């Protein structure tokens, strides 16, 4: 039968819709020959109802819905969940190309934090970290980052309050995608920038570039920068973070000072405590000297074991003594005991392997 010319043609568009702003969706909708008000409907179904397929949008005309089935939204598939005794859930998510990434949902009272990945694998090869043992495969696109938050929010049936870019990958090596994702998470999904933390081992020039960005979308940059320091001196840092051998710790700290001056935001320093390596009293003194006069905060993270390396977690007494030594030097410090140990979802343990502790999908 000959077509009348009135039936909608099947729409194909390889670029997922997730991550697009309302004006961008308006342009897309009008290009499909639809009235611009459909964009607001699409926007609401993408970001408030977390749809996986455009055919789910019941307010669209049936014929047009059917023509849109091939248009990718940009959602992943949960292939596995593993749960720690604290209630933290690690998710293995299958992407459109079959690759697997990890995201973690971390409950705390009435709040829900999502730890997101920014890359598939990681090129930094930090000696204590499981992710780096598998090498780097590719960057994640903005929609693949945004999807992790929507997936956890949908699974928990609870609004996400905080996001930490501390999953797989080095966020500042994928900065454009990370900033695009943060713009959407903040302005389209409604998660405050002050509830978002971006972590980095420190890439030469990238912290300054981040500071000079100044804005995310049409809003001032207000998220927290967390720098994975992990050592009080260059020798220990070179051992733990091979990439730091070409980036002196003094240069890193100067770039962090510039960041504070430009943005007015303090820097958080992450410091994983490893028994017998960087947890001694004299090393607490060295760390305090490094950070003297710095607008910063230190998160001490007792090491979370992985199979591939021999590092050990210090005793609680040693952790407390290290923290007290910093406080005596007027360094703001918090001890972060990880909640995801039972699910291999703690800091340094993410590697996109299936866990034996799972819930049904």
Swiss-Prot record:
Keyword terms, alphabetized: 4Fe-4S, Cytoplasm, Disulfide bond, Iron, Iron-sulfur, Metal-binding, Methyltransferase, rRNA processing, S-adenosyl-L-methionine, Transferase, tRNA processing
Listed GO MF terms: 4 iron, 4 sulfur cluster binding; metal ion binding; rRNA (adenine(2503)-C2-)-methyltransferase activity; rRNA binding; tRNA (adenine(37)-C2)-methyltransferase activity; tRNA binding
Binding site for S-adenosyl-L-methionine: 169-170, 199, 228-230, 304
Cystine bridges: 115-347
Cofactors: [4Fe-4S] cluster
Domain Radical SAM core: 108-344
Family: Belongs to the radical SAM superfamily. RlmN family.
CDD domains, sorted: Radical_SAM (cd01335)
Reactions mediated catalytically: adenosine(2503) in 23S rRNA + 2 reduced [2Fe-2S]-[ferredoxin] + 2 S-adenosyl-L-methionine = 2-methyladenosine(2503) in 23S rRNA + 5'-deoxyadenosine + L-methionine + 2 oxidized [2Fe-2S]-[ferredoxin] + S-adenosyl-L-homocysteine; adenosine(37) in tRNA + 2 reduced [2Fe-2S]-[ferredoxin] + 2 S-adenosyl-L-methionine = 2-methyladenosine(37) in tRNA + 5'-deoxyadenosine + L-methionine + 2 oxidized [2Fe-2S]-[ferredoxin] + S-adenosyl-L-homocysteine
Cofactor binding annotation: Binds 1 [4Fe-4S] cluster. The cluster is coordinated with 3 cysteines and an exchangeable S-adenosyl-L-methionine.
Gene (UniProt): rlmN
Residues of the active site: 102, 347
Database matches in PANTHER family: 23S RRNA METHYLTRANSFERASE, RADICAL SAM CORE DOMAIN-CONTAINING PROTEIN
Gene Ontology biological process: rRNA base methylation; tRNA methylation
Protein name: Probable dual-specificity RNA methyltransferase RlmN
Xref: PROSITE patterns: RADICAL_SAM
Domain of life: Bacteria
């Amino acid at each position: 039968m000959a077509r009348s010319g009135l039936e909608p043609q099947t729409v194909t568009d390889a670029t997922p819709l997730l991550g697009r702003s309302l004006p961008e969706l308006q342009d897309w909708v009008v290009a499909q020959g639809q009235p611009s008000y459909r964009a607001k409907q699409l926007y609401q179904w993408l970001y408030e109802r977390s749809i996986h397929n455009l055919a789910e949008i019941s307010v669209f005309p049936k014929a047009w819905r059917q023509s849109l089935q091939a248009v990718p939204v940009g959602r992943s598939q949960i292939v596995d969940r593993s749960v720690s005794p604290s209630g933290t859930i690690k998710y293995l998510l299958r992407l459109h190309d079959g690759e697997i990434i990890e995201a973690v949902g971390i409950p705390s009272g009435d709040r829900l934090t999502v730890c997101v990945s920014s890359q598939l694998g990681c090129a930094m090869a930090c000696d204590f970290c499981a992710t780096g043992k598998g090498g780097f495969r590719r960057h994640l696109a903005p929609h693949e980052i945004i999807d992790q938050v929507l997936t956890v929010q949908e699974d928990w049936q609870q609004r996400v309050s905080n996001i930490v870019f501390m999953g797989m990958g080095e966020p500042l090596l994928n900065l454009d995608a990370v900033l695009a994702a943060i713009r959407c998470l903040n302005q389209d999904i409604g998660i405050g920038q002050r509830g978002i933390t971006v972590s980095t081992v420190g890439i030469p020039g990238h912290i300054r570039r981040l500071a000079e960005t100044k804005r995310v979308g049409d809003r001032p940059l207000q998220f927290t920068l967390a720098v994975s320091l992990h050592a009080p001196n260059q020798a220990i840092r070179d051992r733990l973070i091979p990439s730091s051998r070409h980036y002196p710790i003094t240069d890193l700290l100067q770039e962090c000072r510039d960041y504070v001056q430009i943005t007015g935001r303090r820097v958080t320093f992450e410091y994983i405590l490893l028994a017998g390596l960087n947890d001694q009293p004299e090393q607490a003194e060295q760390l305090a000297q490094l950070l003297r006069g710095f607008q910063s905060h230190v998160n001490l993270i007792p090491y979370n074991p992985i199979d591939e390396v021999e590092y050990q977690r210090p005793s609680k007494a040693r952790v407390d003594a290290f923290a007290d030594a910093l406080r005596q030097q007027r360094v703001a410090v918090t001890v972060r005991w990880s909640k995801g140990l039972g699910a291999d979802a703690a800091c340094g343990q993410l590697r996109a392997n299936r866990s034996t502790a799972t819930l049904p999908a």
